[in-house]
Amino acid sequence: MTSALFIPELGQLRMILALCFAVVQAVVPLLGAWPGDRLWMSLAQPARWGQFAFLLFAFGCLTYAFMTDDFSVAYVANNSNSALPWYYLFSAVWGAHEGSLLLWALILGGWTFAVSVFSRQLPQVMLARVLAVMGMISIGFLLFLIMTSNPFSRMLPQIPADGHDLNPLLQDIGLIVHPPMLYMGYVGFSVAFAFAIAALLGGRLDAAWARWSRPWTIVAWAFLGIGITLGSWWAYYELGWGGWWFWDPVENASFMPWLVGTALIHSLAVTEKRGVFKSWTVLLAIAAFSLTLLAAFLVRSGVLTSVHAFASDPERGVFILIFLLFVVGGSLTLFVRAPVVKSQVGFNLWSRETLLLGNNLVLVVAASMILLGTLYPLVLDALSGAKLSVGPPYFNALFIPLMGLLMVVMAVGVLVRWKDTPVKWLVGMLAPVLLGSVALAVVAGIAYGDFNWAVLATFLLAAWVLLAGVRDIFDKTRHKGLLKGLPTLTRSYWGMQIAHIGIAVCALGVVLSSQNSAERDLRLAPGESMDLAGYHFIFEGAKHFEGPNFTSDKGTVRVVRNGKEIAVLHPEKRLYTVQSSMMTEAGIDAGFTRDLYVALGEPLGDGAWAVRVHVKPFVRWIWFGGLLTGFGGLLAALDRRYRVKVKSRVREALGMGAAV
């Protein structure tokens, strides 16, 4: 028991030791890479082991403090309570700023560890530089953690008898899965950044670095997309207003690096396969990681008031801003000073290179538009004190047409060839796709019963993407036959097809749920009912229940259609007793083609309640499409050629180690 009293101090010591190892990892291998000293470069390996092990130990210490209700630790006292269920005790470890930053540092250490383990066949000088850059990033976050955000600070000598409890919004499975997935994506872009900076330091921007960094970038992009999808799903059912995206600044902060990351993985493919867009690809790698740091600044600086933002103080914001400026300024300085790279490879207008460049431009313009809409109100407020809100009308008006254009380019890009595509051949490929898309869109519109132009256009674009993929599959298997040819297609190819289908499915969900949702607010007493979109909702009243750390008024709503009961929903109004916070828990009947969503408002006396009812068609397709896209990315990253062909690529690049 006595030894347990020192667990927080052990955790703090491990963070400091991890910082020491990060310094060794950042400095020694980089110094060794300059003259080609193998011994110094090899020290990156034990340094990354030490950093990751000590961060894992520190995270374990903080977890132990939560699980044992150690309220002498300020972070535990502020974000836990003895009545909190054990699974929320565990997720509370990263439920606020300090713990989430420790999780960020741990995941960064994990990415570094993974790169060093799975990249052993790289030239030693390249690997040393990559690990050194990742060590520098770790130094920044660990200094931020230790100096301004120590999760092990004590509340001595006055130890509270109980904690202040975890924010009721976070007492949900969403906290268990959403932040780790999001951070895996955020931090994962540091790998692409590290490879890009290592290539700049080596003075050689060839196709090799693109091949080495591409699978890591795809994995990071997939995790970030899955994290964003889970966050949207969490907000939908937890916040009680029935929405899944509000263009909140913190939502935008996660979406921007995903958009630039999407451009990056396509640009890496061009650089790897054709040796073009080399400088542009490096710039995208820098931008993707810089945007993740911007996201950290927006969430943790206190400049935003958002349901997603951590309450913070200006000191933390200044630290992150300095770190962001250091990373962006330093990397752009290296980029500008790098030798000009001229591609010796040409390509024509109708080529995959051109279409992927168009893909990149659309995605970067979309990200820039979101960046402008997110930062402009903050800059205006800082300079003049004027308050301005940039909301959904701005973002929807600009973003939706860009995404429509992207889906057009996406389908054509799958069918065109590298370097040059005969126009006659391309027309022959696209004509049946276009005709089939129009036919499918009309049939789908008739079956759906809505010829709204937005809905019809979305059906057309989704069919366009789907049929282009099918046409390409038939084209690639035509020599061997479909049954014999399908097994020869690579995981990377299938991952690309699945990800594109996921985008189409998500687009259908977005438009159909937005255009055709029905909503109604009404005062209902027990036994009263309402009708909405062909459904009959009968309110049977609410009963009082006691939870582990809350009290609840749980309603019962029966749903009838065509005289048959199809669902019983139980919306709740919860009072979390420790913080005296009132929360809404929606009652949802999820279906493949629609969600029935009921939320309780305020009690109105005599057993009556304000009741909000939504009927949301195809809303689940949004998250299914997002998860499908992420799965496609992970499948592509598992392609066998990244493991088998890496040896030949390394042999091609071995001259790098001797020349620089």
From Swiss-Prot:
**What GO molecular function annotation could you give as one example from this UniProt entry?**
heme transmembrane transporter activity
Pfam families the UniProt entry points to:
CcmF_C, Cytochrom_C_asm
Cellular component, GO annotation: plasma membrane
Its membrane topology: Multi-pass membrane protein
Give compartment(s). Answer: Cell inner membrane
Primary residence: membrane
Transmembrane domains' residue ranges: 15-35, 49-69, 99-119, 126-146, 181-201, 216-236, 250-270, 279-299, 318-338, 360-380, 395-415, 426-446, 450-470, 493-513, 618-638
One GO biological process this protein is involved in is: cytochrome complex assembly
**What UniProt keywords apply to this chain's record, in alphabetical order?**
Cell inner membrane, Cell membrane, Cytochrome c-type biogenesis, Membrane, Transmembrane, Transmembrane helix
Which residues does UniProt assign to the signal peptide?
Answer: none
Q: Which InterPro entries match?
A: CcmF_C (IPR032523), Cyt_c_assembly (IPR002541), Cyt_c_biogenesis (IPR003567), Cyt_c_biogenesis_CcmF (IPR003568)
| Reported function | Required for the biogenesis of c-type cytochromes. Possible subunit of a heme lyase.
Family, according to the entry, reads as follows: Belongs to the CcmF/CycK/Ccl1/NrfE/CcsA family.
Question: Protein name, please?
Answer: Cytochrome c-type biogenesis protein CcmF
